[in-house]
Every structure is written in structure tokens, then in C-alpha cells.
Amino acid sequence: MTFDAAAFSVFDVDGLDGRMEAIRAQLWPLFNKYGRSIAEHVQLRLELEQPLFVHVAKHLRRTAYAPESTWVAIGGDKRGYKKYPHFQIAINAQYVAIVLACIDNPLHEKGIAADFSSRASDFDDLSFDYVLIADHTRVSYEALSEVDCKGFFERVASVKKAEWMIGRVAQPGSAELALNGISFKTKTCVFPMTVRTINIKIFVREVITASKTDTTIDNGNFAMIAVINENI
């Protein structure tokens, strides 16, 4: 996907109004393009009847400070995405991140974390360039290979405001950000795990069975995670 110098330059613009104008001009077209592409791909791979929703961050609650990062989320429902695990393309002054995100205390967060913790060794199958972002409000990240995944997800399951994003990052000027469109290589950044890794499809069925009285559950929102098992 193409995020060039102009895309990163939005973070050089001072002030909320000026930066938002730059974000709308430079980034929203990219977010809509790549967000729809990912949504269509996931829907096709999982044979979902309903399309995945694409939510471009509007930052409407901001009244003074310019956003230091911005993003598009793929998943959730018509009203939003934060209460569901979702895919996300995010950009800040240092990198573009393509991740699976579980932030802002989504539905079944503790169950997901407990399942991930019990299968922590499966993360060893991921390639060396995977990262963990433990706070979506900060730019810092850790190489996933250096993280105690079992301990980390045990903490997520027990701490109310714990969160995580797992995926890959690409710096300005990198080959990954110079591609025209979402290529095969970039798709592997979004849907990267092999069939040997975490079998979320089993967990999905368990969640839905255990929570069948919760009318907010949409199978597509959880099935979206299952695509990570695919080696596309």
C-alpha cells in the first residue's frame, strides 16, 4: 500500500483544524481504499453474508489538541468498532501499523485473552517482524518474539484496562509502503498466521455458545479473527 512522504507530512501541520484538514485530504482516501479492500477480502475468505464495516477515525471529540495518530478500523457494527476485536491500519509520524486490535475493553476481552494465554506457544510460529503494541495511544512497540505472551495475556485477562494490538509496522520510505494497492505481501501483513497457529474458530463457537443470550453478538465480528489462521 502507498503511504508516501505527503501522508506522513500531516503530522508536521500544527493545530487541530489544520491537521484534520490535512488528514482528510491526504489520509482519508487511502483509508477508505485500503479499508474497503481488506473488508471485501475478509468477507470473501470467510463467506460472510454481511459485509464488514469500515470506520475511518473522525476525532470528533477533540477540541484542542491535534491527533498524533489516526486510523481506519475494519469490523464492528454500524455504530462503531471499539467494542469488538477489529483490524486496523494506523499511521503516526514514525510508522504505519497493520494490526489486529483489541482495545478499549471490547466484548469478551477476558475470554479472548485467556484463550491466547493458554496457547501462547503458538505465537512462536509467527515471523520475526511481528510486534506487540500494548498501548494504542503510544508509538512504542515490542518485538513479539521478545514478549512473554503467556504472562502478557494473563495480565490482559486480569487487568481492566489492559489492551493489545498485534501485527507489523512499516517505516516511512520502506518498500512495503511504496506498493500500489494492497499486494500479496501486504495481505500477509494483515492475515499472517499459518494453519498451525491459534484456532480461533473453535474459540468463536465457544464464545457464541456460552453467550447465546447476548443479542449484541454478531458471528462476523468474531469470525473476523479466524481469518488470521489463514496462510494467504
Tell me the role of every PLM-derived stretch.
Residues M1-L46, R138-I208:
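Long, solvent-exposed, polar/charged low-complexity segments
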Residues W71, D129, E163:
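A residue-level signal for beta-strand positions that form part of recognition/binding surfaces
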Residues A97-S145:
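Compact, glycine/acidic-enriched structural inserts
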Residues I208-A223, V227-I232:
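Ser/Thr-rich, low-complexity intrinsically disordered segments
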